[in-house]
């Protein structure tokens, strides 16, 4: 994807550079001492199941495009490339160079691409990422990822598997049980969505845990899930139902579950309101998990982004958007994490 994007930009007349063995790259137009940055990512979340169209082919029907990455974030990247091409073709004189920076590890949360860019390449004096919602985003919640580990107890649960990534609401989960000396397999289906909007999905791990409640009521895992997670999306049962005026409620998603050696491992994705520190989530989670013999590891803590929605940056973006669209919607805060 990165090779293609850079080749496309070269054909359109941009200056391009491939950075550090395909980790990231950029393409730019214009002249000037400083750079305005457009940060886009070319990686995608796992396709999952239930597609009506080939996930990794671009399909068009009734004026709509279908395929993994069409909206997040390959489609917006292409839109920005051709906006830059229009500026180039129009011969508009720019005070600064405009550079689109392509990354490839946004969805994984590693962001080693942007770390490399920051260390080795020129930093923009201003930037935005076309990776969220209109009209403009002035804040992103704190992103917390946790790994929960507990012994695979002798309560009849032999194996359990579900989910593809912590930042996706899982649409499938299956378990293998031993009941009255006989093995039994059960499955549960759900509806995938992004972990920042778990209300848009249906968590298959939660659905399977509910089924297990009647089959293995003494299982520590089953009791923990029932008592501390359940069907709640906002951390109420865990004791961390945080909220603030600017960014709303905390969201929590059990994204993956599996068995490694003799342990059961879950990954939980939390989007915490912008005014709270990580400990406001981590400490209640650890206390709740300890009651069931579960170890909690904080594997990612990405601080929140918060800008003045009445400041110059947001005001200018809104002015252009409103002039072109006639839409006077207010800027918002999101749960998703981006290159911003």
Residue ranges with predicted function:
Residues 95-202:
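Histidine/acidic-residue-rich, glycine-tolerant segments that coordinate divalent metal ions
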Residues 5, 77-87, 177, 208-212:
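Buried hydrophobic packing segments
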Residues 35-102, 108, 120-122:
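Active-site metal-coordination/substrate-binding segment of hydrolases
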Residues 199-206, 210-261, 275-280, 295-340:
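An extended, acidic, His-containing surface patch that forms the Zn2+-binding/catalytic region
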Residues 1-39, 43-47, 265-267:
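N-terminal helical capping/dimerization or prosegment-like subdomains
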Residues 267-276:
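A short interface-forming secondary-structure element
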Residues 183-185, 280-289:
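Short amphipathic alpha-helices in soluble, non-transmembrane regions
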